[in-house]
Structures are given as structure tokens and as C-alpha cells.
């Protein structure tokens, strides 16, 4: 399954690379990468080192393209605006490519897809999106989880947080009834917080692609990222990193990398 996804991603890159000309130079200086410190398995900090699927993949891409990276922690709610204004050269944090976000930043070719998990404490009566009515549901502001909740469970009481850790803390204390995270993040929280009696009650797989964000018009940097991504897919690095961080992630049959 993962080989199929890797192949599809690789095929999509051919068209994207052809469209990447040169404008703003990526340069030889260190690139500042805005990322998160608490969003497993995509982007998190462990023993003082930024890691996760997205960040390790970006490191491999950078090595292939001889790019230097400096990872800096931020909040997801402000990440894209910080890329847009040039505070960060790259945004790396399982960023879903939506039409609204493309108005603010440009994206690399897709390298993964969005999968969500509805997580709840025992005894809340939450089993799926239809049972969220009147419940206090935590989401990180500005994420696909936020927009998904508004579209699919408008009668739920959305409680917005700046980052995953704050939503998890509220869920553990009972300040909210449930939360929506990336599926793998939700499963990790449930496994590592047994006393909180958390459960991923429903997984929601989408075909929304993930991409690294760059400032609009920076086609040179986007082109370097895409060239490196193509290379690490071809040499098997993509699959190894994916297997390391998301070994059980389902791959939707209808997923098409590069779909806009």
C-alpha cells in the first residue's frame, strides 16, 4: 500500500517540477523552518531535537539538495502567516493543501494526506460525528480539524486551541468532551495516557494532500524541495520514514498525489 502511495506521489512530482521556474533564490544561507513541538507523528520535539515524519522527510530532502535547515517552534494558528511574511522560509507540520491556504502561501508537491481521528473520554457518549451535537469539542484553530468540525458537526460546541498539547490537556481534565486531531496523533495520545481513558472513536480518512509551505512566488525553493522529494521517493527514503512514523496509517484508494 505504501509503495503504491509513494509511486503516485513520485508520478505527481514530474508535472510539478516542470512548472517550477526560478524567481526568488533559495540561496546558500540557512533556511528557517517553522514547525511544531507537540504534534506527533508529523512534527514534534524529542530530547531537544525536532523530528517527526514531516521534519525527517524535510531533512532528507535538504541533504539531497545541499540545503541547511534551522527548525523553530511555533503555533499552527500562526504558521502560515509567518511563512507568508518571510519569518520562516518553510512551514513543516502536516499542512493540508486547501484552496483557502493557497491564497496565502505556495506549496510543494504533495507528500502525504490528511487523516483525522475523533477522540473522546469514556462516558461521554461520543461515537462518531453524529453524536457531537451539544458536545464541547476541541480543535486547533485554523486546521482542517477546525473546518471539518464546522462542516460536519455544526451543532457541536467548537473549543479552539493554539496547539495540540493545550487541547489534549483540556481533554484529559474533562474541560472538553472530545477533540479532533490527526489520526496518528490521536492514537498516540490514547496509548500514552491510559489513566485519562481516551479512545479514538472514529477515523476519518480524506484525500486532502499535505505539502511543505513556502512564501508565494518562491518557485526556486519550491523547485528544490520538489526535486529532493522526487529523489528521496526514488531511493526508498520516503517509504522508510513513513514506515517509521506512520506504520499503520491507511492509504485511501482514491488518494491522488498532486490533486489540487
Model regions and ranges:
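Acidic, polar ligand-binding/catalytic clefts
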Residues: 68-131
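A ligand-binding cleft/hinge motif common to bilobed small-molecule-binding domains
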Residues: 94-103, 150-151, 177-207
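C-terminal motif of bacterial Sec signal peptides marking the signal peptidase cleavage site
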Residues: 15-19
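Periplasmic-binding protein-like
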Residues: 112-120, 187, 191-227, 248-260
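Short helix-initiation/N-cap motifs at beta->coil->alpha
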Residues: 71-81, 124-125, 141-144, 159-169, ...
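Extended ligand-binding regions for polar small-molecule ligands
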Residues: 21, 55-64, 143, 211-249
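Extracytoplasmic small-molecule ligand-binding "clamshell" domains
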Residues: 26-94
Amino acid at each position: 500500500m505504501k509503495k503504491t502511495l509513494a509511486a503516485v506521489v513520485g508520478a505527481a512530482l514530474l508535472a510539478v517540477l516542470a512548472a517550477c521556474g526560478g524567481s526568488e533564490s533559495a540561496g546558500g544561507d540557512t533556511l528557517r523552518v517553522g514547525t511544531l513541538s507537540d504534534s506527533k507523528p508529523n512534527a514534534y520535539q524529542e530530547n531537544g531535537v525536532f523530528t517527526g515524519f514531516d521534519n525527517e522527510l524535510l531533512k532528507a530532502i535538504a541533504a539531497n539538495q545541499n540545503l541547511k535547515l534551522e527548525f523553530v517552534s511555533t503555533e499552527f494558528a500562526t504558521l502560515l502567516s509567518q511563512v507568508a511574511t518571510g519569518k520562516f522560509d518553510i512551514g513543516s507540520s502536516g499542512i493540508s493543501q486547501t484552496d483557502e491556504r493557497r491564497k496565502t502561501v505556495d506549496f510543494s508537491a504533495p507528500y502525504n494526506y490528511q487523516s483525522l481521528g475523533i477522540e473522546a473520554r469514556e462516558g461521554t457518549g461520543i461515537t462518531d460525528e453524529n453524536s457531537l451535537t451539544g458536545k464541547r469539542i476541541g480543535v486547533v484553530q485554523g486546521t482542517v480539524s477546525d473546518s471539518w468540525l464546522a462542516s460536519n458537526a455544526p451543532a457541536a460546541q467548537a473549543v479552539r486551541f493554539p496547539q495540540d498539547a493545550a487541547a489534549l490537556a483540556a481533554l484529559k481534565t474533562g474541560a472538553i468532551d472530545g477533540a479532533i486531531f490527526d489520526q496518528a496523533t490521536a492514537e498516540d495520545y490514547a496509548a500514552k495516557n491510559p489513566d485519562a481513558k481516551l479512545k479514538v472513536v472514529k477515523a476519518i480518512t480524506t484525500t486532502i494532500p499535505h505539502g511543505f509551505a513556502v512564501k508565494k512566488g518562491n518557485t526556486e525553493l519550491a523547485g528544490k524541495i520538489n526535486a529532493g522529494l522526487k529523489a528521496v521517493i526514488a531511493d526508498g527514503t520516503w517509504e522508510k520514514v513513513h514506515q517509521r512514523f506512520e506504520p499503520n496509517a491507511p492509504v485511501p484508494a482514491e488518494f491522488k498525489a498532486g490533486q489540487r
